[in-house]
């Protein structure tokens, strides 16, 4: 039994949260810009990236001035996109504010690959560990091009390929296929912090 719910947060790009209705106690989606904004409004918190710029990997780590959780690519982004450019200590502060904690690496892996729900949908089997966070196939595992599958929109989801108005980057949270334990974006989108 977990002492505190898990806060799923990403490194320079960010995820977070915990819910009782997902077997491993992790929220279904990454922490959004909107959710992180609530934390900032309540606490007056300021991130390092707001002062010094965000880090991106372009054949090596590069600092991008004005890139931060509010402006992931130097421009304002919608509140349903994942909060990014968050350091480990900032992720810990956010989790603590929510009464949560970062998952241990093995907890994150188990949540993303081993079905733990008591009554999962027919496409999943309780106790089974899958090769991909979406099950037996990488299709829908949150690759920008659907991991090579056809690019038709997923039923009930926005056409997130068109939504990436920058032409690159991450998708809004929860726009991809629901995977193991009903979680989204465990196959990519942004990097998560774990202990």
Regions found by a protein language model. Give the residues of each.
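Short, structural beta-strand-to-alpha-helix junction motif
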Residues: 31-32, 87
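Conserved hydrophobic/aromatic "anchor" residues
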Residues: 24, 36-39, 94
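Boundary at the C-terminal end of the N-terminal hydrophobic targeting segment
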Residues: 18-22
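Functional-site microenvironments in short loops/helix caps that host divalent-cation chemistry
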Residues: 46, 51, 56-58, 63-84, ...
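Bacterial N-terminal signal peptides
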Residues: 7-15
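Bacterial N-terminal signal peptides that target proteins for export
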Residues: 1-6
């Amino acid at each position: 039994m977990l002492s505190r719910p898990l806060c799923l947060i990403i490194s320079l790009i960010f995820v977070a949260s915990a819910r009782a209705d997902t077997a491993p106690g992790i929220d279904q989606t990454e922490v959004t810009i909107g959710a992180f904004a609530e934390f900032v409004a309540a606490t007056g918190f300021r991130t390092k990236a707001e002062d010094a710029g965000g880090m991106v990997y372009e054949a090596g780590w590069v600092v991008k001035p004005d890139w931060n959780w509010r402006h992931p690519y130097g421009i304002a982004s919608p509140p349903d996109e994942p909060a990014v450019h968050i350091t480990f200590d900032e992720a810990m502060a956010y989790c603590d504010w929510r009464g949560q904690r970062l998952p241990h690496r093995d907890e994150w892996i188990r949540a993303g690959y081993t079905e733990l729900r008591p009554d999962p949908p027919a496409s999943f089997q309780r106790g089974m560990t899958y090769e991909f966070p979406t099950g037996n196939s990488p299709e829908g595992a949150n690759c920008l091009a659907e991991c090579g599958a056809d690019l038709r929109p997923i039923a009930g989801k926005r056409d997130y390929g068109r939504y990436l108005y920058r032409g690159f980057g991450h998708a809004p949270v929860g726009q991809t296929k629901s995977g193991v334990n009903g979680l989204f974006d465990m196959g990519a989108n942004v990097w998560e912090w774990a202990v």
